Amino acid sequence: MMAAKPVREIIKYADGTVKARGSRLNGEMHGAWSFFRLDGSLMRSGRFDRGRQVGVWKTFTRDGALVKDTDFGA
């Protein structure tokens, strides 16, 4: 049996602007993900391990300044 491979996914707002970008493995968020505001600015980025947030997630202001790091552990 072949191992499942991550599938890239782009989620968009109704107007077509990218809302989120990342990969899914067996239907679950897996690997690096980035989430964007409706204005296109990066809001948050981090990693998932089979649907669970892991490691350090970064949250940004609209102008790109780092607001906080949130550590979800391994």
Walk through the language-model features, giving the residues of each.
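Glycine/tyrosine- and acidic-biased, solvent-exposed loop/turn segments at the edges of beta-strands
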Residues: 1-74
